[in-house]
A protein has these predicted regions:
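Short acidic-hydrophobic surface loop/beta-edge motif
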Residues: 4-6, 81-83, 116-123, 129-131
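A glycine-rich beta-to-alpha transition motif near the start of alpha/beta enzyme domains, typified by
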Residues: 1-100, 139-199
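Short, solvent-exposed secondary-structure boundary/capping segments
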Residues: 100-108
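Alpha/beta catalytic cores of group-transfer enzymes, especially the acyltransferase/condensing modules
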Residues: 111
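Glycine-rich, charged/polar anion/phosphate-binding loops
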Residues: 114-117, 124-127, 156-158, 168
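Internal active-site segments that recognize and position negatively charged phosphoryl groups
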Residues: 120-147
């Protein structure tokens, strides 16, 4: 089995070319794994597993790496791709220079917003704003994301009974009209350096 390690904004994944066969028990490998298979309706299919072995419907940084992977490995020469995911198809635009992908943008679709939910964790009440972009997120606006004990609060919010599917959690503070500071707890993976769908 040949693998490739890639990262998008610091989120690293192991990529497995499943176009010619791959293990059926992907969650059993228990790593942050993305398997690229033939497309159902699109050009390719992305199957994603979190570090704990749970299946992820969508990963923004992961799907950008899929675009780079399939182009740089010569599996396609298209610069506009449709990737099938468990959250539905996503369209990628690849910016190519000198035969290599330099940047990938993804149309994530329109996020679905829900009313805020209050959740208790570590003696504090957090106002969590549910947002769904193909996978569930909970955004908590706070003055200092860096001060939140993310390793303790993250798993409590992720697994709260208010969110039966579990959620990715982003603690965010608006610093200017153009800048947010964000810390991320991803369901099934824990603290990560970034989150494409959470952005």
């Amino acid at each position: 089995m040949h693998i490739t390690k890639m990262h998008g904004l610091g989120n690293d994944y192991i990529y497995l070319n499943g176009l010619e066969g791959a293990p059926e028990d992907l969650p059993g490998l228990a790593v942050r794994l993305i398997c690229i298979r033939p497309g159902r309706d699109g050009d390719f299919t992305m199957e994603m597993c979190n570090a704990d072995g749970s299946r992820g419907a969508m990963c923004g940084n992961g799907i950008r790496c899929v675009g780079k992977y399939v182009y740089d490995k010569g599996l396609t020469r298209k610069t506009c791709l449709t990737i099938d995911t468990d959250a539905g198809p996503r369209v990628l635009e690849l910016q190519v220079r000198g035969g290599r992908v330099e940047q990938v943008t993804v149309d994530m679709g329109i996020p679905a917003l829900s009313p805020a939910v209050s959740v208790e964790a570590e003696g504090e009440t957090y106002t969590v704003w549910p947002v769904d972009v193909g996978n569930p997120h909970g955004v908590v606006f706070c003055p200092a994301p860096e001060a939140v004990p993310l390793e303790r609060v993250g798993p409590i919010l992720e697994g709260s009974g208010a969110f039966p599917q579990r959620i990715n959690v982003e603690f965010a503070a608006a610093r200017t009209r153009e800048r947010l500071d964000v810390r991320v707890w991803e369901r099934g993976s824990g603290i990560t350096l970034a989150c494409g769908t959470g952005a």
